[in-house]
Amino acid sequence: MTSKKKLCYALLFMSSFSFGQSSSDQLKELINSALERDGQYQQQNLELQYVDIDQKRLTDTFLPKVELTGRVGYMDTRINYTSPEFGIPRVPPLFPGMMVPSQNNTLGISGFSGVSKLQASVVLYSGGKVGHLKKALNEKKLSQQELLSSSKNEVITSIAKIYDQFALVHQSKKVLDESKKRLEINRKTAEKALGYGLITPYDFKKIELAQVTLDTKMVEYEGKRELLITQLHILTGMDKKRIAEIEPDLQVLNYVVEDKSIENRPEIKALNHGIAAAEYKIKAEKTWWIPKVQLSTSLSYFGLYGDHIQTSNDVVPYLVKKLDIHTKPLSLFPMFNAGIGFKWSLFDGNTGKREAEKSKIDKMVLENKKADAQRKLQLNLANNQTNYDIALAQIELKDKARKIAKNALDQVEKEFRYGVKKSMDLIDAENDLEKAELEYKTAVFNQRRAAIELMKSTQNLDVEKF
């Protein structure tokens, strides 16, 4: 294989890789990129992580809690006391007896002490509250996932609209290019007719003016195209050059509503899960009076070091001298304790009752929102169905109009060549066709908008169908 052939194959491969994507693939890539950059969508994703953490915290309720505490300190205690006066009877002839006088004394104890404790506890039964709260959180998570789906629908709709606007501008360019070609051909015909005296210079200038007007529309087209490229760049983060290479197609989007139920709408599903979460919350609050059971155990240590025990006077006058003792270290270990305890709230000051009442009101609020949403979404479905039917009818009418305009232009061009029609008639016919073509493209754009809104009405958005 020669170098030239290798180069040709390489260029062919690169071209097919760059432009081989279908319109559906291009749109999906734009939507996925937009979802990664959409602030509200990402915020809701983060809020879902909060719920995950709350679920883990509830599960952790039944995990053991282990604590190790310790304390080392210096102790210095003084006890003031007065010993009573008492007598010792005599024991003849061994002991003559004696009186022991009353005496004020101070007992002092000083030294270092150390205490440590290892304690473990685990909840065995929460009264059913944790179980109900876990179910409530699960429903809350499902509700937020539905709201996330709703935000995704909005991003899809927004990007699809800009994509179709991009396609409409692209199709408009083709219409303008066709008009430019026809005007150039008719201009050459007009030059010959002017040379033969079949038309006046004024008629010829009219054709030149039409060409300038068309060039102005071309400039407007470039401005609109650049604006749409910038919009897609900001929303998706994709490179402008890559977006500029997209050549979207604008085709009629047919859709038939098979199921007219709105119950699959994420807004309704989110409210259903919210109502279920409120029900579990009510059940959880009603468990306030059920006893909670906990298992606990501990291992403790107590020690005395460098203790000094002393008195200011004799402990017993004449009999027991004053104390001045330095003791050896004293320790108590192990001190082990284990058992099962319970907590039974016989009356909590109506706290649990009031919380249950609040949860009931929350449930009623959600039920009212659901009823209101159902009415509005049902009306929205009917409105979108009507708009879709009108949009389809508009396409049929606009298609007939452009065919009539095309036939009229063909007839005027023939008559212009034979000098029967003036240049103004030709320009009017050209403008009529251009307008009819653009109105047809706009009708297709509007029909696609109506079809996508109708899909969204019953939660049947499918990018593959776009």
Where on the chain are the PLM-derived regions?
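Short flexible linkers and secondary-structure junctions
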Residues: 22-161
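Primarily recognizes Gram-negative and organellar outer-membrane beta-barrels
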Residues: 21, 37, 67, 71-109, ...
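Structural signature of outer-membrane beta-barrel domains
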Residues: 73-77, 125-127, 300-304, 347-349, ...
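Periplasmic alpha-helical coiled-coil/stalk elements that build and connect Gram-negative outer-membrane
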Residues: 3, 29, 53-55, 154-269, ...
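Residues on the lipid-exposed face of transmembrane beta-strands in outer-membrane beta-barrel proteins
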Residues: 72-74, 118-122, 232, 299, ...
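Sec/SRP-type N-terminal targeting helices
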Residues: 42-46, 59, 110, 124-152, ...
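Bacterial Sec-pathway N-terminal export signals of envelope proteins
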Residues: 20-78, 239-240, 244-283, 290, ...
